[in-house]
Design a protein with these regions (language model features):
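Structural motif
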Residues: 2-3, 31-34, 107-108, 127-128, ...
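Nucleotide/pyrophosphate-binding catalytic subdomain
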Residues: 1-243, 248, 340, 416-418, ...
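Internal glycine-rich alpha/beta core junctions
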Residues: 123, 261-263
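Short helix/loop capping segments that flank catalytic or ligand/cofactor-binding pockets
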Residues: 44, 174, 212-213, 259-261, ...
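Positions that flank functional sites
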Residues: 135-137, 208-209, 266, 333, ...
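A conserved regulatory-domain signal marking ACT and ACT-like small-molecule sensing domains
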Residues: 269-438
Length: 438
């Protein structure tokens, strides 16, 4: 049995969290290869180290004195070192980092949180430190070079029984430090799990897995103990943020389960993510997630269905502006294009002008206060009447459905409602399928 064990920013925020990690590692000898993020917030008003590093880079870029920002960063690491009684000469490394700041790229600067954290963690656990820049390789198109990365990881696996590995970065095809998107430490852990053929990828954070709904909307929502990759992808895409959605693909391809666990409550069951889960939750749905601030463009044209390529023309206009499309619900003579407001706001009027000129619609309207809520669950396809029950519940609660979209795999029903009805919609769906479990 081999586990890749990744700890997020809240799990490495201070010396006390380091101690919890050591206890977790010592409880299970299969936790041999550890990935860490940069230290996160210790309390609500605190700063994440990565945020401070981005701020440090901005000061450097605009020639503003950055000494006060650097001091905050340095003190965090020294505090961890001193409280744990470590010998790592991290002060010298940090000072050298600051001295050479102007010669560094943004990627190098913002990746140092993981780098320094991994160095301290390696000493504290008595494990080897393996630098991600020597292992993870990107291609010119910024995708992972799996062959090169896997070969380098296998070599380190043969060399060390245990090591600590910094998340979030690797090396580009040109030999420079390259970072993943924010939260990319999850991706690093998934890469290690795939390349080392792990049996489980453990992802430790500050919550006990996924919940069936947002706890800021639904009071004490039930936890999700088992979920498929497909369900997770749907929920993550719509805003359920425990795991970086791009971390799913490497382990899904290798059929490796992900186990989301809580560093502060290691006894909790957490959430197991695997492609084919035989465990039934007892509910027709797995979870509910949603996002606000979408825009819907409605296009109506008489006899549209007789015009070959009519919808394609609209999509090609949006493609020219690099606009990603969320949904395209359609009828015989009309269709809606749903996009995120922030993607289209700057170019909206130009795009509408192109639509009028090239599509010559009989009606063209825009609704810009849309929220999307997805109800997700592999069990829905086995339960006739699920969508009818959902729509009926919303109607009974005077929530007007502006848009409906259902995936062909029948694990997701997405409804569009006015932004003002977002919270109420999530609550009603939860109460309908979970609160009053049949």
């Amino acid at each position: 049995m081999l586990k890749i064990t990744k700890f997020g920013g809240s799990s490495v925020a201070n010396a006390e969290q380091f101690k919890k990690i050591k206890n977790i590692i010592q409880q299970d000898p299969t936790r041999r290869y550890i990935v860490v993020s940069a230290p996160g917030k210790r309390f609500a008003a605190d700063n994440k180290i990565t945020d401070l590093l981005y701020l440090l880079d901005a000061h450097r870029k605009y020639h503003v004195d950055a000494s006060s920002v650097f001091k905050l960063i340095k003190n965090r690491f020294i505090e961890i070192k001193n409280e744990l009684g470590l010998k790592q000469p991290i002060e010298k490394e940090l000072d050298a980092f600051y001295t050479n700041l102007n010669q560094m790229s943004q990627a190098v600067i913002v990746s140092r949180g993981e780098y320094f954290c991994a160095k301290l963690m390696a000493e504290y656990l008595g494990y080897a430190f393996v630098d991600a820049k020597d292992i993870i390789r990107f291609k010119l198109d910024k995708s992972i070079d799996w062959d090169a990365t896997s070969a380098k990881l296998q070599a380190k696996y043969a060399q060390y029984d245990h090591f600590v590995f910094p998340g979030f970065y690797g090396t580009s095809a040109n030999g420079h430090i390259q970072v993943f998107p924010r939260g990319g430490g999850d991706i690093t852990g998934a890469i290690l799990a795939k390349c080392l053929h792990a049996d489980v990828y453990e992802n430790w954070t500050d919550v006990s897995g996924f919940l069936m709904a947002d706890p800021t909307i639904v009071q004490n929502p039930k936890g999700i103990t088992h979920i498929t990759y497909s369900e997770l992808r749907e929920l993550s895409y719509m805003g359920a943020s425990v795991l970086h959605e791009e971390a799913i693909f490497p382990v899904k391809e290798a059929n490796i389960p992900i186990h989301i666990l809580n560093t502060n409550r290691p006894q909790d069951a957490g959430t197991i993510i695997q492609e084919h889960s035989k465990i039934k939750s007892g509910y027709p749905i797995t979870g509910i997630a949603g996002k606000k601030d979408f825009m819907s463009i409605y296009i109506y044209k008489k006899h549209m269905s007789n015009e070959v390529g009519y919808i394609r023309k609209a999509l090609s206009i949006l493609e020219k502006y690099h606009i990603s499309i969320e949904h395209i619900p359609s009828g015989i003579d009309s269709f809606n294009i749903v996009v995120e407001k922030k993607e289209i706001e700057e170019s909206l009027y130009e795009i509408l002008a192109h639509f009028k000129e090239e599509l010559k619609p009989d009606k063209l309207t825009v609704q810009d206060d849309l929220a999307l809520i997805s109800t997700v669950g592999k069990n829905m396809s086995d339960k006739p009447g699920t969508s009818g029950k959902l729509f009926g519940a919303l109607g009974k609660n005077n929530i007007n459905i502006v848009m409906i979209a259902q995936g062909s795999d029948e694990i997701n029903i997405t409804v569009g409602v006015k932004k003002k009805d977002f919270t109420k919609t999530v609550q009603v769906i939860y109460d309908t399928f979970v609160g009053g479990n049949e």
